[in-house]
Amino acid sequence: MEGFGVHTFRFVNAEDKSTFVKFHWKPKLGLQSVAWNEAVKINGADPDFHRRDLWNAIQSGNFPEWELAVQLFDQDFADNFDFDVLDPTKIIPEEILPVRPIGRMVLDRMPDNFFAETEQVAFMTQNVPPGIDFSNDPLLQGRNFSYLDTQLKRLGGPNFTHLPINAPKCPMHNFQQDGHMAMRNPVGRANYQPNSHGEGPRESPSRGYRHFPADEQGQKARLRPESFADHYSQARQFFISQTGAEQRHIASALTFELSKVESLAIRERMVSHLLNIDETLATTVAQKLGFQSMPKPADAAMPTRQDLEASPALSIVERGPMRFEGRKLGIMIADGVDAKLLKALTKAVAAQKAVIELIAPKVGGVTADDGSSIEANHMIDGGPSVLFDAVVLLTSHQAIDDLVKEAAARDFVADAFQHCKYIGYDQSAMPLLEKAGISGQLDEGTIQLSDSKDIEAFVEKLGKLRVSGREPSVKLGKASPPIA
């Protein structure tokens, strides 16, 4: 995932000059997501799937890494931009204002104690070092208050900053003393300044935090600015920035969620909002919900702008990894598997800095064609294809008859195909493809592996992660025809 701070902050230099900034985290391995049907099955097969993936990556030395990047702009840009930069629901497209990398974050170890180092973390937006300051973003200002209030209640009192995970590495002195669960033992008679005892901490104006001296004008009122009133234009821009497959997924997600809403009036009201974003999206959702007629578009404070261009930076597919690094290949094996072919495949995947896991009829493993024993990571029932980014079927003529009788083996193949994953297979696995119902639909994402050249071609394609051209044929998020 990417991280996006939504708020506008300030960078303030030593001369008290301010530059607006928006923060981004950009994953080194690119963006990736799963289909809804796939997510449901993942949660059933392994509820800890994502945290296990993170844990295994760190333990194996494949440290997840993000780039810290910023969008920087001045007051003149803010005054002339199409939307209010203080509106946290709006973005500045990266095509207009590119992000600039300024640092990185590498996750290279797990916490020693999850409660002490994770559960007790007191995250607060107002915790910033000198040089970073706040804008008048109303949601940010609200969070600067409410997060402190939250920690007072969540962690039991004002001294949560004494907990090691929340305490500064360099001891800081202030006038805060005692209170519930205090962990410090200050000495002396005075904890205030000035005092006649000559004790206690002293103010350090040159080193303390100073807010940016911004010039302010206008009325102070609890009103949402008119500049925040355009609720649909960037929603439309986001939708048209997606690929066809992603648009189908959005329509399917909206359909699923709205299908759980009991009130027809609310379903109609939501579709009326969609009409202000994209008519095709709205009619697709309405068709899937069984509407007999379309509602009128919702009243809009401002008309939806049609001149905003698509931003490819908003698409997961357009910004996919294009490499298999950090991903996982699941290989189904059986007794009599071609040991030479398996070894070559393992070597090729390792060269891509990816990992393999073996799935077999028994977790104890199989006996290869050269007589060697190969241990498995999963038995077929416990290692469905949803746990892997791509799959390979390396079976044997002697074992395939038993494999095709196993529902879990057939589901392994059918799900991988339905979820548009790349599938490699040897000649002996053809009966399994037939039983899974995909032998007549083989495409550029189903590749027969006979030798090292086939393996090289297969591994080279894995970076795409999904065979997007297959999706309409498997009806995964397929769009319905519009209502007239």
Where are these regions (language model features)?
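Internal mixed beta-strand/loop scaffold within catalytic domains of large alpha/beta enzymes
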Residues: 1-40, 47-49
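Residues that flank catalytic or metal-binding motifs in active/ligand-binding sites
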Residues: 5-7, 21, 64, 101, ...
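Short helix/loop capping segments that flank catalytic or ligand/cofactor-binding pockets
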Residues: 19-22, 31-34, 78-79, 113-117, ...
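Short, structured patches in soluble enzyme cores that scaffold and shape functional sites
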Residues: 10-13, 22-27, 70-74, 107-109, ...
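Charged, compositionally biased interaction regions
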Residues: 48-52, 56-322
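Extended, subdomain-level signal for the structured scaffold at the beginning of enzyme domains
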Residues: 218-222, 244, 248-268, 272-418, ...
